[in-house]
C-alpha cells in the first residue's frame, strides 16, 4: 500500500458526511460537525460512571466487566474524532469499535447468560477464542473493503437484540424486568433518527434543524449504557454466592425511572 493510499484514509471529509455537514465548520473552524461531535460526551462518560460505581465488585469479583465498558468509552472518542474530521479512518474505527463492543461483551458476559447451552460450558475458552478470531478476521477485511462493516454490524446487532430481550426477561431480577423494553424503545427511536437524518436531509435543512444524528448519539448512548447496567446486575446476581455484595437499580434525576432518566447501580456490602 503506497503513501497516497494511506493518506486517503486521513484526508478531511473522505468519510461519510451527515446532514449537519451542511453547516460544517461554522461553530468551530476545526470541527466539521459540531453537534454530532459534542453529543458523544455521554457515550464517553456514562460507562466510566458505571465502572466507578462498581469498582469494589470489579476489584473483588469480576474485573473482566471493565473491558466492554471501556470499549464503549473508546467508541465515543472514536466517534468524536470521526465527526470532527469526517475522515475515512475515523469512520471505520468508529464503526469497527461497535463490532468489538458486541464481541467483547459476549466474551465477558457469556458465562452468566441463560441462552448459552450448559453442555458447552466446559469449552467456554474455545468458544471465546472462536468469537475473537472471527471478529479479528472481519475487522481486517473491513479495512480492505470498508462497506463490509455495515454488513458486520447488521449480522451482530440483530441477534444481540434477541439476546437482550431474552436475558432480561429470564433474569428473575425485578429491578431490570422492564429493561429490555426500555433498551429496545431507546434503540428504536435512535435508529429512526439515524435513518431520517440520512434519508430526509433536505427536509431537515429546510427546517434549519439537521441535528437528528446528534439525537441518535444521545439516545443510543443511553441505550448502550442501560445494557451494561442490566448485564452488570445479572452478573452480580448470578455470582451472589461467591461475594458479599447486594445491588439495586436507582434512577437520576427522576427517581421513578422515566424513559429518559439515567439508571445506576447502588452497590452495598451485605450486613454480617
Swiss-Prot record:
GO cellular component, as recorded: membrane
EC number: 3.5.1.23
Cofactors: Zn(2+)
Catalytic activity: an N-acylsphing-4-enine + H2O = sphing-4-enine + a fatty acid
Swiss-Prot/TrEMBL keywords: Glycoprotein, Hydrolase, Lipid metabolism, Membrane, Metal-binding, Transmembrane, Transmembrane helix, Zinc
Compartments (UniProt record): Membrane
EC category: hydrolase
Binding site for Zn(2+): 83, 213, 217
GO biological process, one term: ceramide catabolic process
An example molecular function term from Gene Ontology annotations: metal ion binding
Known glycosylation sites: 256
Parts of the chain that traverse the membrane: 34-54, 61-81, 96-116, 124-144, 148-168, 183-203, 214-234
Membrane-protein topology: Multi-pass membrane protein
UniProt record similarity statement: Belongs to the alkaline ceramidase family.
Its biological purpose: Hydrolyzes the sphingolipid ceramide into sphingosine and free fatty acid.
Protein name as catalogued: Alkaline ceramidase
Protein source organism: Caenorhabditis briggsae
Amino acid at each position: 500500500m503506497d503513501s497516497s493510499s494511506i493518506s486517503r484514509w486521513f484526508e478531511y471529509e473522505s468519510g461519510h458526511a451527515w446532514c449537519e455537514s451542511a453547516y460544517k465548520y461554522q461553530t468551530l473552524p476545526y470541527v466539521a460537525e459540531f453537534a454530532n461531535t459534542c453529543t458523544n460526551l455521554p457515550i464517553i462518560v456514562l460507562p466510566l460512571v458505571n465502572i466507578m460505581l462498581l469498582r469494589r465488585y470489579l476489584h473483588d469479583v469480576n474485573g473482566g466487566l471493565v473491558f466492554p465498558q471501556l470499549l464503549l468509552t473508546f467508541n465515543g472518542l472514536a466517534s468524536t474524532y470521526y465527526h470532527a474530521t469526517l475522515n475515512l479512518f475515523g469512520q471505520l474505527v468508529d464503526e469497527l469499535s461497535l463490532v468489538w463492543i458486541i464481541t467483547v461483551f459476549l466474551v465477558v458476559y457469556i458465562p452468566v447468560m441463560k441462552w448459552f447451552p450448559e453442555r458447552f460450558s466446559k469449552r467456554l475458552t474455545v468458544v471465546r477464542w472462536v468469537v475473537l478470531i472471527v471478529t479479528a478476521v472481519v475487522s481486517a477485511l473491513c479495512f480492505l473493503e470498508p462497506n463490509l462493516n455495515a454488513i458486520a454490524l447488521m449480522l451482530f446487532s440483530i441477534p444481540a437484540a434477541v439476546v437482550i430481550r431474552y436475558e432480561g426477561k429470564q433474569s428473575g431480577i425485578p429491578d431490570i424486568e422492564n429493561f429490555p423494553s426500555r433498551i429496545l424503545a431507546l434503540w428504536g427511536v435512535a435508529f429512526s433518527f439515524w435513518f431520517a437524518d440520512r434519508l430526509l436531509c433536505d427536509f431537515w435543512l429546510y427546517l434549519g434543524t439537521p441535528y437528528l444524528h446528534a439525537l441518535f448519539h444521545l439516545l443510543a448512548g443511553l441505550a448502550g449504557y442501560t445494557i451494561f447496567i442490566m448485564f452488570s446486575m445479572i452478573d452480580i446476581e448470578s455470582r451472589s454466592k461467591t461475594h458479599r455484595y447486594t445491588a439495586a437499580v436507582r434512577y437520576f434525576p427522576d427517581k421513578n425511572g422515566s424513559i429518559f432518566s439515567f439508571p445506576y447501580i447502588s452497590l452495598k456490602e451485605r450486613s454480617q
